[in-house]
Amino acid sequence: MERMFERDVIPTCKELNIGFVPFSPLANGFLSGKYNKDTQYKGDNVRLAITRFIPENVVKNQPLLDMLNDIANAKNSTPAQISLAWMLHKYDFLAPIPGMRKYERIDENLGSADIELTEEEFKNIETELDKITIYGNRTDEDIQKMGYVRAQ
C-alpha cells in the first residue's frame, strides 16, 4: 500500500496507457500481517536489510496492519488479499504479482481478485491511508546492492 509512485510514475503510466507492475506489492510480506516486532530473521533473509522490518518500525506501522486486519475480518479474507484487492480496485492498468513461495499463497493471492470493495470501503481505505505514516523503507540501498550486477 506504498503510495510513493502515485505522484509521478502511475499518472505517467495512465497518461501513456502503459501498464504498471508493482514490485513486491505485499512489501516483502509485511502487508500479510504475519510478521511482528519479535520475528527473528536468519541467514540471508532479505528482511534483515529492510528498515520497515526493524522492531521499532513494525510497532510504528501497526496502524496500517490494524486497518488491514479490520477490513479482512469484515470481509472474511486476509490482510494480503485486502491489500491486493485495493490495488486492483484503484487502477485498471495495474497488475500486482505477489511472491508465492508456498502453494497456499497462490490460492490466497488469486482470491484477492474475487474481493469486491464498495466505493465506500475503498474511500475509507484511502482516507485512512492518508492519515497513516509508513516508517522504514520497503527496499533499501543494501537490497539494491544485493541484486545489482554490473555488466562488464
Residue spans for each PLM region:
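Beta/alpha (TIM)-barrel catalytic core signal, keyed to glycine-rich beta->alpha loops juxtaposed to Asp/Glu
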Residues: 1-127, 146-152
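Short coil/turn segments at secondary-structure boundaries
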Residues: 137-142
